[in-house]
Structures are given as structure tokens and as C-alpha cells.
């Protein structure tokens, strides 16, 4: 085994400014958090029913809902993950924006007109009408797993950034700090609990109306934070966008091919594009967080405006965060960071391993090279873990060491904003699913409006405890994993079958409940297996292909089962295909959209 290569980067750790949060930074952060809590309290006083708590009375402004859709799906995952990916692949990572025009056609033209005619609170009510309660409950359970994983990754990334920036050293005080891990376990445990519980406390107060309006403010804060980051770098270095892009193009990044038949190839233009396409259409067609936003506006026209606003915001922030990534890459040339030094050393060591492998292939033949590659595999995995963690830590360490006070506090507030916009949305949606898909249909007696509203708030608080525990486990499981990869492994493995289930319900007149349950379960097995293919099979699988692979498995299995299971949907269930829904003039009335069967009386197949 080769020793780590010596980096060409000199030992400059002694000149890295100490940094950390100043009193002025803390004042900015506290004022921001107090404002969010105050808004939640103010809106909570006006809520009288679960319709207000879950849907805002279906009367929220379309533009605000659009910003909320985007802000909820952005989170610290993208806010920190995209700059980290820019270090890894350079401007090639912008190919993730390529499928957005095609996604616009699907969501604008197919999904929104359909869902807005159904008068839903939970998206999974539709599956009860089209299939039966078993399919509805199964999909709702896996959406809850998706949301738990999603919120947990958000809390984890926010906590990691805060530990990097604040330099708490709680572990040193308790005697449990392990300097070799990079992350301090005691620090992370405390911050995970604090971030998660504060966000859930704020969310239990104001419901979806508070979520939407605080998302608007949080969107503005995170935009200002990103723009100020680039502005400060431009001012401090006397550089501009042209300098940053030129430097990025001249830097050797991980190569991104256009296409590859190797499913273990992490990123190609094709896999990034196809992965983002399926992620978008499945999220906007099956994820309660996105669909619940559309249900808060009055009609199809306003829902389309909401989606258009979110799509434009996605394109805009994608470019801005790419700008943050390339500007940081330019800045750290002359401004050292622990993370950038670790990145350079890991990159140099990986290059040395590549050179050794290539020399063996040229001098001793392919068989000798394969033997050396097998010997190098463990060392390569460790180096890539170090590299991944270093790339995701550059932005937080830059904030800590080089940003001036007040501006540093504003950017930290933006990190909180990105986390809170996802946490509040996810918590409200989990409470919606538990109330609408489980408590209502399974309860023997109907709760009063006041009782159901109180229960919704209790459920939201309980979800906070679950999320904190889930996040603590995920933290120890995922050390050394890149944030973008962590998204796929932590929760996106559940998304593909959810999207396929809704699409089969909409477009197939033959797929029935038994086909759907079996196909859904197999699709989820494939999604989880693909996410953890290295652990299960000892071979990598591209994280960008996890959602498409699970989606395709579910679709093909359901259609294939038509040949062996003769069950067919009933006439009542066929009323809920997309064509029938759009043609049914009676669906304009909410009463006409109520399900005809519950869990105790399954719809006839």
C-alpha cells in the first residue's frame, strides 16, 4: 500500500485566521431566529381548523407558494452541496439544469391540471380512489420514510456547517473529542438536537401559512447570503466572474463523460440529466411536500404560476450557487483552509495511485494492473471519503475563517434559512399524512376541528423527536459521504416507486391494486439495493440512476403482472384515470371527489 502522496501545497495552516462567530454575528442570527418564531406565533393565533393548518384555506398567493415550493426543495443540501459538487466536477455539474424545460412540459401540462381537479389534502387520497386503501397506506408510509430521511439529511448538513463555522469544541470540554475524525461527535449531537427541535417548535405554531410566508423570507435571506459571498470574494481579490470561470475551466476536475454504459460511473451528462428529470417529475407528481403547496392555491391557473415561479427560482439559484462554487475555488488559491489542504492532498494521493496503476498496465500487463487495483481499492475509498468531506467543508470553513463579522452572521442565517424552509415543510407534510391518511380513515369517531388541530400540532412535535433520533443515526452511518450522494442514499431511494404508482394510476386502465402493491414493493427493494450497492454487492451504482432504476422497475413489474394476475380495476376505480378525471364535469364540486371506500370496506377490484 502506498503512503499518502506529499502535496505540493506548503504547510500554511498557521496563517489561516482563527475566525468563528463574533458577538455581532450572534446578534444577527438571534434576530433572524426570533423573527421566524414571532411570525409563527402571529399566524398561529388566526388558525381555527386543520384546513387552515394544512392548506391555508386554499387561498395563498401563487407567487409566494411558488417561492415556498422552491425554498422547501432547496435546503442546505443544495446550498452546501452544489458548491461542493462544483469543486468536484466544475461547471459540468450545471448539466443538472438541462431537463428543466422538459420537466416544465410534464408538470405544467399533465400533473397540475389533473391534481387540481381532485380537491385533495393528502396526495395519497387519490390512490385510495384509483386502487384501494392498501395502496394508499403503503405509499403514505414510504413517503413518510422519504420525508424522515430528507429532513434528517437537511438537519445533518446544517449541523455540520454550524460546527465547522462556530468551532464549538464541546467534545473537548466533555473529554470525548476525537481530533482524527474531523467532525466532533459531541458537538454534532448537541447541534443536531438544537437545530431540529427549534425548527419543529416553530413549525408546530403556524401551519402551512407560516411555512409559506417564512419560506419567502428565508428565500430572500439565502439569496442575499449567496450574492454577498460572491461580492465579498470579488471585492477582496479584485476578480470577477470571468476570472472564476477561466480558473475553473483550467483546473483539472473529475471527468464527466457524455454517456457511459457503466452504471457504476457516478456522473455522466446523460445520468445527471436523466436523474434530475425523474427526480423532478416524481417529486412534483408524488411527493406530499410539493403537491400540498399546489393545493393551497385557488385553481389550475394559480398552481401553474406557482410552478413557473419555482422553476425560474431553481434556474436562478442554480447559477448563483455555481457562481459561489467557482468563486470559492478561485479564492482558496491564495487563502488556505484546512479543507482545501486536505482536498489537495487527497487529490495528489489519488493521482499517485492512478499513475502507479497506469505504469503497471503499460509495463506488466492488464492482469498485473488488476491485482494492483484490487490492492488499492480500500485506500482509494478512504481517500475519496476524505476528499468528499473536504469539498463539502470548504464553504463553511470559508465563512468561518475569512468572512467579516455581520456578513458572516448573515450567511449563517442563510444556512439556517435553507434548513428551516425544508424542516418546516417536511414536518407539516408528515403531520398532514398522518392525520389525513391514517387517523381520519382509521378512527371510529370523528374528531372536532379544535381536537384535530391540536392533534396535528402534537404530531408535528412528535415528528421532531423522530427526526432528531433518525439524524443522529444517519450522522454515524454517513461519515465521509458527499452531501449529494447522501441525498440519494438517505431518502431518494424511495421516490421512484411513488412516482410510478401515481403515473400508473393516471394512465393505465388495466393495472389494479394487487399489481400495484407487488410492483411497488419490488421497486422499493431495487431503490434501496441500488443506494447501498457497494455494501450489498461490492460494486458501485451511480447515485443519479437510483430514482430512474426504481421507477422503471415499478412500471415494468406492474405491467408485466397483467399477464399473470387477471385482476382488473372496477368501473368506480376507472373514474380516477387522468382522462376520466379531466372529462368529468362533476368533479368541480368537492363532494364529488370524496372516496367511496375506506380501509374497512375496500373498493371492489
Task: Give residue spans per PLM region.
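Membrane-embedded helix-loop-helix hairpins and adjacent transmembrane boundary segments
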Residues: 2-605
Amino acid at each position: 500500500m502506498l503512503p499518502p502522496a506529499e502535496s505540493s501545497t506548503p504547510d500554511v495552516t498557521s496563517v489561516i485566521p482563527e475566525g468563528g462567530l463574533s458577538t455581532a454575528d450572534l446578534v444577527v442570527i438571534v434576530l433572524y431566529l426570533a423573527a421566524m418564531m414571532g411570525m409563527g406565533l402571529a399566524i398561529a393565533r388566526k388558525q381555527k381548523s386543520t384546513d387552515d393548518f394544512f392548506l391555508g384555506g386554499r387561498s395563498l398567493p401563487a407567487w409566494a407558494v411558488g417561492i415556498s415550493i422552491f425554498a422547501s426543495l432547496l435546503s442546505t443540501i443544495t446550498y452546501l452541496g452544489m458548491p461542493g459538487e462544483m469543486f468536484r466536477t466544475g461547471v459540468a455539474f450545471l448539466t443538472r439544469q438541462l431537463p428543466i424545460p422538459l420537466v416544465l412540459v410534464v408538470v405544467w401540462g399533465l400533473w397540475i391540471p389533473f391534481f387540481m381537479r381532485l380537491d385533495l389534502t393528502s396526495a395519497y387520497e387519490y390512490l385510495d380512489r384509483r386502487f384501494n386503501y392498501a395502496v394508499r397506506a403503503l405509499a403514505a408510509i414510504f413517503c413518510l420514510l422519504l420525508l424522515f430521511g430528507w429532513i434528517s439529511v437537511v438537519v445533518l448538513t446544517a449541523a455540520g456547517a454550524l460546527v465547522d463555522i462556530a468551532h464549538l469544541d464541546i467534545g473537548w470540554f466533555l473529554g470525548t473529542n476525537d481530533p482524527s475524525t474531523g467532525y466532533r461527535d459531541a458537538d454534532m449531537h448537541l447541534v443536531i438536537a438544537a437545530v431540529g427541535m427549534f425548527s419543529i417548535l416553530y413549525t408546530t405554531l403556524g401551519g402551512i401559512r407560516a411555512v409559506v410566508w417564512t419560506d419567502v423570507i428565508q428565500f430572500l435571506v439565502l439569496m442575499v447570503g449567496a450574492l454577498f459571498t460572491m461580492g465579498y470574494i470579488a471585492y477582496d481579490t479584485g476578480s470577477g466572474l470571468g476570472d472564476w470561470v477561466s480558473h475553473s475551466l483550467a483546473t483539472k476536475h473529475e471527468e464527466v463523460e457524455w454517456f457511459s454504459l457503466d452504471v457504476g460511473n457516478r456522473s455522466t451528462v446523460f445520468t445527471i440529466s436523466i436523474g434530475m428529470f425523474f427526480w423532478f417529475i416524481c417529486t412534483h407528481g408524488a411527493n406530499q411536500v410539493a403537491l400540498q403547496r399546489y393545493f393551497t392555491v385557488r385553481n389550475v391557473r394559480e398552481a401553474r404560476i406557482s410552478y413557473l415561479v419555482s422553476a425560474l427560482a431553481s434556474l436562478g439559484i442554480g447559477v448563483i450557487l455555481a457562481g459561489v462554487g467557482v468563486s470559492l475555488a478561485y479564492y482558496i488559491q491564495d487563502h488556505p483552509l484546512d479543507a482545501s489542504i486536505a482536498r489537495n492532498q487527497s487529490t495528489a494521493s489519488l493521482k499517485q495511485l492512478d499513475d502507479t496503476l497506469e505504469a503497471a498496465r503499460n509495463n506488466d500487463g492488464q492482469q498485473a494492473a488488476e491485482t494492483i487495483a484490487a490492492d488499492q481499492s480500500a485506500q482509494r475509498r478512504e481517500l475519496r471519503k476524505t476528499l468528499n468531506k473536504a469539498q463539502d467543508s470548504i464553504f463553511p470553513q470559508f465563512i468561518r475563517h475569512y468572512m467579516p463579522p455581520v456578513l458572516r452572521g448573515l450567511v449563517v442565517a442563510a444556512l439556517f434559512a435553507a434548513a428551516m424552509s425544508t424542516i418546516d415543510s417536511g414536518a407539516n407534510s408528515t403531520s398532514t399524512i398522518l392525520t389525513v391518511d391514517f387517523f381520519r380513515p382509521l378512527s371510529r369517531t370523528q374528531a372536532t376541528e379544535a381536537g384535530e388541530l391540536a392533534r396535528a400540532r402534537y404530531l408535528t412535535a412528535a415528528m421532531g423527536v423522530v427526526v432528531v433520533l433518525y439524524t443522529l443515526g444517519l450522522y454515524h452511518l454517513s461519515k465521509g459521504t458527499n452531501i449529494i450522494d447522501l441525498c440519494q442514499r438517505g431518502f431518494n431511494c424511495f421516490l421512484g416507486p411513488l412516482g410510478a404508482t401515481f403515473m400508473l394510476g393516471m394512465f393505465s386502465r388495466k393495472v389494479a391494486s394487487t399489481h400495484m402493491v407487488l410492483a411497488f414493493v419490488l421497486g422499493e427493494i431495487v431503490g434501496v439495493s441500488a443506494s447501498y450497492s457497494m455494501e450489498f454487492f461490492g460494486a458501485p451504482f451511480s447515485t443519479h440512476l437510483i430514482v430512474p432504476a426504481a421507477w422503471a422497475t415499478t412500471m415494468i413489474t406492474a405491467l408485466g403482472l397483467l399477464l399473470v394476475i387477471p385482476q382488473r380495476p372496477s368501473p368506480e376505480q376507472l373514474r380516477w384515470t387522468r382522462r376520466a378525471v379531466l372529462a368529468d364535469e362533476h368533479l368541480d364540486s368537492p363532494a364529488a371527489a370524496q372516496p367511496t371506500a375506506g380501509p374497512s370496506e375496500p373498493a371492489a377490484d
